């Protein structure tokens, strides 16, 4: 999973990236501190594999991972090449989902490119640039197929779709709210355009420390972000990038104490992971043994052979059966052999849909 972190200059984007990845990316109080996208691989916090590791006395515990890309700050006019616009738009096309950091804190020491704090304006600035970029892509497609569409029914059908999506964008709406016809061709065409505004989006409302305890409930800027996200089907989570940066330097025990003192249940990374898995429809299954306990990320609805293929393509090709036990059942039993004796280990075939928290042993030829 690859997430692109975007936002206007000086909203806390690189500070958040630094704290999530501990990568120490250059973070400065001026536009375009991030010129090339910084990339960081982050472990997905999951206590299940830690506990499985203890149960199996395993040599190695391997969590699932998320790749974060810190993409250069964006300004008005990026779709026409202003600032670092073209580079920004090329980088963002490669990600699975967008994490849009929005400034919801007041601080006279940190300049805002537009001189004031206004999340609605900031969101619209970036969204409009993404829309303009998508319209340009659709215009290029229209120019390519319009002439041939007069004599080709399939291209005529695609042209109708492209023009409908373009009209939707010209109304200021994101492509992800466009209702694609329930038709296989239309679905394939729409996906093939790889539109920026079709990508799932998570808004990170970056607040001051005082707004964390009530999850931004008393912050009018956060309320506006939530309202706009609801209209476009996006997720929102509240974060204080400055606090996340401090947490990144602490041990797990110190982190817990610090969060308790703040009156906060989970870190920003935990919130972001939960939002990412939710908006992308992802789950994790687990494999366990003395050599390694590991979490694997798959789409909800994935069947056993395809899940096996995440481990190795040979597992999918030669799939025979999957031995499956629920993580909590295995933990309660204290040993795989006990879970088997109690009839909690099931033998599943190729049509089995893998569930979150399944501990699986694949049998393959």
Question: Where is each model-derived feature located?
Answer:
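C-terminal-of-GTPase-core extension/linker across diverse P-loop GTPases
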Residues: 2-6, 17, 146-353, 360, ...
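Flexible interhelical turns and helix-capping residues at alpha-helix boundaries
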Residues: 9, 131-134, 194
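Conserved G1/Walker A P-loop phosphate-binding module
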Residues: 1-111, 139-140, 144-145
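Conserved Switch II/interswitch segment of TRAFAC-class P-loop GTPases
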Residues: 40-45, 72-82, 93-155, 168-182, ...
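Short, intrinsically disordered, mixed-charge
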Residues: 22, 54, 90, 128, ...
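Glycine-rich, flexible loop/turn motifs
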Residues: 23-31, 38-40, 48-51, 80, ...
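Amphipathic alpha-helical transducer elements in NTP-driven molecular machines
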Residues: 32, 46-49, 62-68, 82-96, ...
């Amino acid at each position: 999973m690859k997430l692109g972190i975007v936002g206007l200059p000086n909203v806390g984007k690189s500070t958040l990236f630094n704290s999530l990845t501990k990568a120490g990316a250059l973070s400065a109080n001026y536009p375009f501190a991030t010129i090339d996208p910084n990339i960081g691989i982050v472990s997905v916090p999951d206590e299940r594999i830690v506990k499985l590791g203890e149960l199996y006395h395993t040599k190695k515990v391997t969590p699932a991972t998320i790749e974060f890309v810190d993409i250069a700050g964006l300004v008005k006019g990026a779709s026409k090449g202003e600032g670092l616009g073209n580079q920004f738009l090329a980088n963002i096309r490669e990600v699975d989902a967008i994490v849009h950091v929005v400034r919801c804190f007041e601080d006279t020491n940190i300049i805002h490119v537009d001189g004031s704090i206004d999340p609605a304006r900031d969101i619209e600035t970036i969204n409009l640039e993404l829309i303009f970029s998508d319209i340009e892509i659709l215009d290029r497609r229209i120019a390519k197929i319009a002439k041939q569409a007069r004599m080709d029914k399939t291209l005529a059908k695609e042209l109708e779709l492209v023009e409908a999506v373009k009209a939707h964008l010209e109304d200021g709406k994101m492509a992800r709210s466009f209702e694609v016809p329930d038709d296989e061709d239309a679905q394939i065409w729409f996906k093939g355009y790889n539109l920026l505004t079709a990508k799932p989006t998570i808004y990170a409302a970056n607040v001051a420390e005082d707004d964390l305890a009530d999850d931004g409930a008393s912050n009018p800027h956060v309320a506006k972000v939530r309202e706009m996200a609801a209209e476009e089907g996006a997720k929102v989570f509240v974060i204080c990038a400055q606090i996340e940066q401090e947490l990144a330097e602490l041990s797990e025990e110190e982190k817990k104490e610090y969060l308790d003192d703040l009156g906060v249940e989970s870190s920003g990374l935990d919130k972001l992971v939960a939002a990412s898995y939710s908006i992308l429809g992802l789950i994790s299954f687990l494999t366990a043994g003395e050599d390694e306990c590991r979490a694997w990320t798959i789409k909800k609805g994935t069947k056993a052979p395809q899940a096996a293929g995440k481990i190795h393509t040979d597992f999918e090709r030669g799939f025979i059966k999957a031995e499956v036990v629920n993580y909590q059942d295995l933990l309660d039993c204290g040993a795989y052999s006990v879970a088997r004796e109690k009839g909690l280990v099931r033998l599943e075939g190729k049509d089995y849909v893998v569930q979150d928290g399944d501990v699986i042993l694949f049998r393959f030829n």
